[in-house]
Amino acid sequence: MDSRSPSLPDDRPDPPEQHLDARAGATLRGTAGPRGVRRILPFLGPAVIASIAYMDPGNFATNIEGGARYGYSLLWVILAANLMAMVIQNLSANLGIASGRNLPELIRERWPRPLVWFYWIQAELVAMATDLAEFLGAALAIQLLTGLPMFWGAVVTGVVTFWLLNLQKRGTRPLELAVGAFVLMIGVAYLVQVVLARPDLAAVGAGFVPRLQGPGSAYLAVGIIGATVMPHVIYLHSALTQGRIQTDTTEEKRRLVRLNRVDVIAAMGLAGLINMSMLAVAAATFHGKNVENAGDLTTAYQTLTPLLGPAASVLFAVALLASGLSSSAVGTMAGDVIMQGFMGFHIPLWLRRLITMLPAFIVILLGMDPSSVLILSQVILCFGVPFALVPLLLFTARRDVMGALVTRRSFTVIGWVIAVIIIALNGYLLWELLGG
């Protein structure tokens, strides 16, 4: 059986890289190997790539609007959403490790062909819609930083994402490190913004006490939690862990699952802190100051300068750029996994990147509002959530798929509770968006 991740086509070197596999193998076998933090470094990476989807331009808009309108009161919602995401992404990663298959492959192998075709079409549409919003977010950030028209910002975005995707020719690790650098860039930018904004620490603490301030905050809370699960990275995460590190025994797989849990908690925890920082900065800067339409990214950028100084605006745009570039590249990777998994074939990543860029250029040339496109992508995302969640929970609970690493019944119940909550909230959000 070929255990390579389908996100890495045949013309690239077989992952994982030899040095990564050697260090990881020593740890998994319990033989002499790296100690301390160095011991877990080979196992960090897949969740970092997946986590960037939780810091995409859509999250910027939602978090900024939440902080501007309701202060710190929705911090508890971000915390709850992040904990849910940890559970779901951990299940996805475990599926790839335990089964040697990714989620689209398992659906193709075990479900009727007509259903597989339906799954492929809806998953491709969700991935492309998500990528559209992320691509436009990066192009907008370039426009804010340089004054270039959106069209040329999109051209630069395309070139940089081509470069990012090309890193896979050198194996999985370079791409993991590059995406990790973008995550670090976003984190540092928001850490400095927190220092500049000086949020009220007592109010921040009170924000973790569950409460809602009327129907408006309830709707925004639904939007934050409803968008917790990103369908395309559920498919992708199971492929990123699939065959990344070679295991020879069930016990080695158990150890790999435990170490992978560290990867998920660390990466998703950092993503959660960054999202909380976004909301806290918006609350400290915009709340109570009659800033209209603060959720619009351009408005947020322009308003930061008079309130916190030009450095805050530049840092905001840099963070948005890092978010858009990396999440757009990850979206293209997810589309590659989706096609290979569901259909059994792939097109070159450069061709897929060209195809998925076209909608963004059309939107720009037509002069459409990027914020409106973000809302449209959210509607399409809502459609895709149950189609990724349900098979994930079904397969991870099956012993014939997971073997000895089948998910414990109590954890499966938690997963289904989370799934029901997220699917219900997405249904409500979808109804509201379409009704509006």
UniProtKB/Swiss-Prot annotation:
It is a multi-pass membrane protein. Pfam families: Nramp. The keyword Cell membrane applies. Residues 1-31 are annotated as: Disordered. GO terms for biological process: iron ion transmembrane transport; manganese ion transport. Disulfide bonds: none annotated. This is Divalent metal cation transporter MntH. It comes from Deinococcus radiodurans (strain ATCC 13939 / DSM 20539 / JCM 16871 / CCUG 27074 / LMG 4051 / NBRC 15346 / NCIMB 9279 / VKM B-1422 / R1).
